[in-house]
Every structure is written in C-alpha cells, then in structure tokens.
Amino acid sequence: MPNLHDIERRIKSVTSTKQITRTMEMVAAAKIRRASERVESALPWAVAISDMLISTAKYAHLDNEPLLQVHDEVKRVLIVAVTSDRGLAGGFNTNVLRYVEKLSKEKQREGAEVEVAACGKKAIGYFTYRGIEPVFSFAGYSADPEFAQAAELSGYVMQAYAEGKLDEVFIVYNHAKNAAEQTLVEQQVLPVKEESYADLLGLKAKEEDIFKSFRE
C-alpha cells in the first residue's frame, strides 16, 4: 500500500500534468482561432474567383486547352496527400492517409501506375515507412503555408499532365468545418471538372446568362 509520501508525489504529478495539458489547450485554441480567421478572410476571394471562372469558362474557346482534355487511357495517376506536421490530432491525419492508400489500390487495380506527393510531416513519414518515395515532399508549412511550395507542385502537375506524363491528379485532405469536425475531401484536380470546384465551394450553376446584357 502506498504511503503518504507516495500519494503526495502522485497528486503533484497529476496536478503538473493537468497544468501542462491546460496550457497546451490554450495554445491550440489560439492557433485554431488564428487559422480560422485566415480561412474566413480568404474564402470570399476563393469563392468569387472560382465563381467567375466557372461562369466565364463556357464562353471561352478552350477545346484545345491541355488541362481540360480527358486522356483516352489512364496510365499514371498522382495523388496529393495533405496532412499536418504534428500528431495528437486523433483521426485527422489517419483518415487522409488511409483514404490515399485505398484510392491508390483502386487505381492500381484499374491498371494505372500511382505516384504520391506528400504535404506534411505525417504524410512524409507514412510513405517513407512503407518504402514509397513521394515525387514531392513539403514539411513545416501546415501552420503557415507559402505560395512558393504550391507553385512548385502545381507547375510540375500542369506540365506533366500537358505532356501526357500524368493522366489524373487527385488531392486528398480534411476540410475543417470547425475545431471538432472535419470532412474528408477527395478532389479531382486534373482533368479539370467544373462540378468538382462548384460543389466544393458551394457554388450553384446560375440560370441567368451574365453576358446577355453585353451581347444585346
């Protein structure tokens, strides 16, 4: 049976752990708040730009645009996995990585060669442990992403697709509805599909012809 000294030491240990946990919660709450503010400030721009592109694309002559062409045969597929850099996030990263593995196996069964791009330390560690070498790896940017990394990856993707080296490109990530709820998203990036972006951003096809007044 523990003596009084052991009990006191145990109480101090539990109290110390509680204080550390509370501090971690406060730090996490502050980070979530800042991230939410950045997302909320950027979303109107994303919606407006996507809405404009969707509305105008059907009036442009894009029949020969390489990024809109559906390839006759799907031989090579790229899947971009987006995770966090740190753990202690429940199923946040696990759900993404398991889905990427599931999607990869589906495409392989269909006869396609699959390569992956890993965004986040958790994705990099997951693929490295399984002997999979990502074509691109980015770490340390989940809290404060930069345009340079996105431009590098998108440049590779667009060039490879236009040259016929890639036939389909998907991105898998978690869409955070709030701090407690995330929705797993699989989005086809290439070939470009209007519905993919419209559904994602909550855009609806407009009944009216926004260019009608200009043509009359």
Predicted regions and their residues:
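C-terminal beta-strand-loop-alpha-helix "lid" module of Rossmann-like NAD(P)-dependent dehydrogenases
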Residues: 1-216
